């Protein structure tokens, strides 16, 4: 599994309730840009339209060597999931305070582009402070253990 992009902001901004793996419908120039790692998913989110799941606001830079089949960098991209997963996501989207965001994009073992999406709930400011405090404490512990060895 070769990770192309990761949404680190999502793990800080949200509580992750459940994760899914989804395929994406892409154009050839988009895949080539992904191989060059020219993608940004920090502001991306997932919505439902006509019983299908769509990824919005993901920026894939234009592939410079593409002649005719250039793509729009921020176009909507359809996500491929099983019907049972789609129904679960649609029911969660309608819940107040819950959203769906991509966590990472990667090439699987077969060379297909996959995205890991998650059902998330927003953190309050005090939750974010607690996360920072815990992270700093873990760093301090590791420094102390290195110095004691």
From Swiss-Prot:
Compartment list = Cytoplasm
Protein's job? Required for rescue of stalled ribosomes mediated by trans-translation. Binds to transfer-messenger RNA (tmRNA), required for stable association of tmRNA with ribosomes. tmRNA and SmpB together mimic tRNA shape, replacing the anticodon stem-loop with SmpB. tmRNA is encoded by the ssrA gene; the 2 termini fold to resemble tRNA(Ala) and it encodes a 'tag peptide', a short internal open reading frame. During trans-translation Ala-aminoacylated tmRNA acts like a tRNA, entering the A-site of stalled ribosomes, displacing the stalled mRNA.
The cross-references to InterPro entries, in alphabetical order and at most eight, read: SmpB (IPR023620), SsrA-bd_prot (IPR000037)
**GO BP annotations listed:** trans-translation
* Protein known as: SsrA-binding protein
Give one Pfam hit by family name.
Answer: SmpB
Keyword Cytoplasm set for record: yes
Q: Output the CDD domains linked to this UniProt entry.
A: SmpB
Q: What's one GO-annotated cellular component?
A: cytosol
Instruction: Name the family the entry cites.
Output: Belongs to the SmpB family.
- Which organism's genome codes for this protein? Wolbachia sp. subsp. Brugia malayi (strain TRS)
Identify the stretch annotated as signal peptide in this record.
none
Q: Which HAMAP family match?
A: SmpB
Q: Which GO terms describe its molecular function?
A: RNA binding
Query: Which keywords label this protein?
Result: Cytoplasm, RNA-binding
């Amino acid at each position: 599994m070769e990770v192309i992009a990761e949404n680190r902001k999502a793990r800080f901004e949200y509580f992750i309730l459940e994760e899914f793996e989804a395929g994406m419908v892409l154009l050839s120039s988009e895949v080539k840009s992904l191989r060059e790692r020219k993608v940004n998913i920090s502001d991306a989110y997932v919505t439902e339209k006509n019983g299908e799941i769509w990824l919005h606001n993901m920026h894939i830079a234009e592939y410079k060597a593409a002649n005719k089949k250039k793509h729009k960098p921020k176009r909507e991209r359809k996500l491929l999931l099983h019907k049972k997963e789609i129904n679960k996501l649609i029911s969660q989207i309608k819940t107040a305070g819950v959203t769906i965001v991509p966590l990472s994009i990667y090439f699987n073992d077969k060379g297909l582009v996959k995205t890991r999406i998650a059902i998330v709930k927003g953190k309050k400011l005090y939750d974010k402070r607690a996360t920072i405090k815990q992270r700093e404490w873990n760093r301090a512990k590791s420094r102390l253990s290195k110095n004691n060895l």
